[in-house]
């Protein structure tokens, strides 16, 4: 019998595809513009570097004759101590590990090699460039740790660079690199990858349009700041602005109570102060012009009365002239509005104090009342009633739901209403009258008698 626990082993072999499929490596090009100014907190950015494109700048090569002096914190006695670093020996004197196939990897002169320093590896002290004719300086066998680390990184970069050059034409690449470096001796030598990107952009193979810088965007769309940033930067100014808003809200409330029929916009503490102020000034200007037009209408009516009286005494038949002109007052409306806009003066600029204007208005209304009574006695025309109808004072009061009229609170009529004598109630209480006989009771009594 076969054993119960049979273990079966499977061998899996990887079979190549019948068609040689190319291996595609995704390439993600670097973005030329990241717009970091729109993402980071601007208070942490140097104002001089705001909206400036970042260009990586390499440290200049220090000659071997110069010495690097690094400042050290002061000693106990307060004197500054400077440490002088000796020149670093030439890199060519350091033995370079030979690659696996030295025949296929051509040697490249030191001038043709260009390397990019990584941001995470910054060798310190800096590598000092020496002249070709000068022999390597003798240095102690014990080297700092930073120099040894730098040389290791240098060797790895050189070996990777050899591999890249070995795949193409070594001599052509070397000559192009030498000529390029000799052409720009004072500038920093660029890396092969950077050179390839630059040549690609110059030849126009990269058809993608470069994004605009942040300066061009702000010129086109404007520099709109977020209003929620640094709201309490100036707290006293914000507090004063809130006080002005409360004052304007109170003024708007008074305007609604004084002019209930006028549509006045509503505002809150979250509204803009400048918008509230402009709206209040424009609303007050419109109401002031309307009030001035009404005053001019009263002046016109007073002039019509004077013309009727004067021309009537001369011999002209002027009876009903004031009434007829008052009914056609709408013809004067346009000219009166234009005159009111022309003579508009803000209350803060008005030279006459409010007390004098109040007394003048009272005298003017008294004069109109007296002249209207005089004309009413002579012509039997109630001009005062016409004036009240014209001014809108005799409109029927609005009745609320509970049955009471709105009265003076609604702004439709005066609290003092003139009541004629014929309609006045008697102050003496009426005598009580006896209740008469009921018709139904008499009929019921007669029917009982007949029965």
UniProtKB/Swiss-Prot annotation:
Membrane topology classification: Single-pass membrane protein
TM region positions: 358-376
Ranges of biased composition (kind: Basic and acidic residues): 175-222
SS bond partners: none
Compartment(s): Membrane
Biased composition (Low complexity): 137-147, 403-414
Organism superkingdom: Viruses
Main location: membrane
Region (Disordered): 89-150, 164-222, 401-451
Biased composition (Polar residues): 104-121
A single GO cellular-component term on record: membrane
The keyword RNA-binding is assigned to this record: no
Alphabetical keyword list: Membrane, Transmembrane, Transmembrane helix
Homology family: Belongs to the IIV-6 067R family.
Protein name (record): Uncharacterized protein 004R
Lineage of the organism: Viruses, Varidnaviria, Bamfordvirae, Nucleocytoviricota, Megaviricetes
């Amino acid at each position: 019998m076969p054993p119960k626990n049979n273990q079966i082993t499977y061998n899996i072999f990887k079979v190549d595809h019948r068609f040689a499929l190319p291996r595609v490596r995704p390439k993600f090009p670097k973005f030329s513009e990241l717009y970091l100014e729109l993402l980071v907190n601007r208070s942490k950015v140097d104002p001089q570097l705001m909206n400036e494109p970042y260009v990586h700048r390499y440290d200049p090569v220090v000659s071997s004759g110069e010495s690097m002096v690094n400042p050290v914190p002061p000693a106990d006695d307060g004197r500054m101590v400077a440490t002088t670093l000796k020149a670093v020996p030439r890199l060519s004197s350091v033995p370079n590990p030979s690659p696996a196939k030295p025949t296929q990897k051509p040697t490249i002169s030191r001038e043709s090699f260009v390397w990019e320093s990584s941001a995470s590896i910054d060798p310190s002290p800096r590598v000092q460039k020496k002249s070709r004719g000068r022999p390597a300086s003798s240095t102690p066998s014990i080297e700092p740790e930073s120099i040894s680390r730098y040389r290791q990184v240098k060797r790895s970069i050189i070996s990777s660079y050899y591999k890249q050059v070995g795949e193409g034409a070594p001599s052509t690449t070397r000559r192009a690199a030498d000529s390029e470096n000799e052409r720009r001796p004072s500038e920093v030598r660029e890396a092969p990858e950077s050179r390839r990107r630059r040549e690609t952009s110059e030849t126009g193979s990269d058809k993608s349009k470069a994004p605009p810088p942040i300066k061009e965007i702000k010129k086109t769309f404007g520099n709109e700041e977020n209003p929620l940033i640094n709201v309490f930067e100036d707290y006293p100014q914000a507090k004063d602005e809130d006080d002005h808003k409360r004052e304007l809200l109170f003024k708007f409330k008074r305007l609604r109570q004084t002019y209930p029929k006028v549509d006045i916009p509503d505002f809150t503490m979250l509204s803009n102060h400048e918008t509230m102020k402009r709206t209040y000034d424009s609303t007050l200007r419109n109401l002031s012009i309307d009030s001035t037009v009404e005053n001019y209408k009263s002046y016109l009516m007073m002039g019509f009365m004077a013309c009727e009286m004067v021309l009537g005494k001369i011999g002209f038949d002027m009876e009903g002239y004031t009434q007829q002109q008052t009914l056609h007052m709408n013809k004067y409306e346009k000219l009166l509005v234009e005159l009111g806009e022309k003579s508009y003066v803000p209350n803060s600029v008005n030279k006459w104090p409010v007390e004098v204007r109040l007394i003048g208005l009272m005298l003017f209304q008294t004069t109109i009342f007296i002249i209207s009574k005089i004309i009413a006695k002579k012509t039997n025309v109630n001009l005062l009633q016409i004036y009240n109808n014209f001014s809108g004072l005799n409109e029927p009061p609005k009745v609320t739901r509970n049955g009471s009229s709105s009265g003076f609170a609604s702004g439709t009529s005066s609290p003092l209403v003139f009541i004629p004598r014929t309609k006045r109630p008697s102050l003496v209480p009426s005598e009580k009258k006896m209740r008469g006989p009921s018709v139904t009771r008499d009929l019921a009594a007669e029917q009982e008698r007949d029965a």
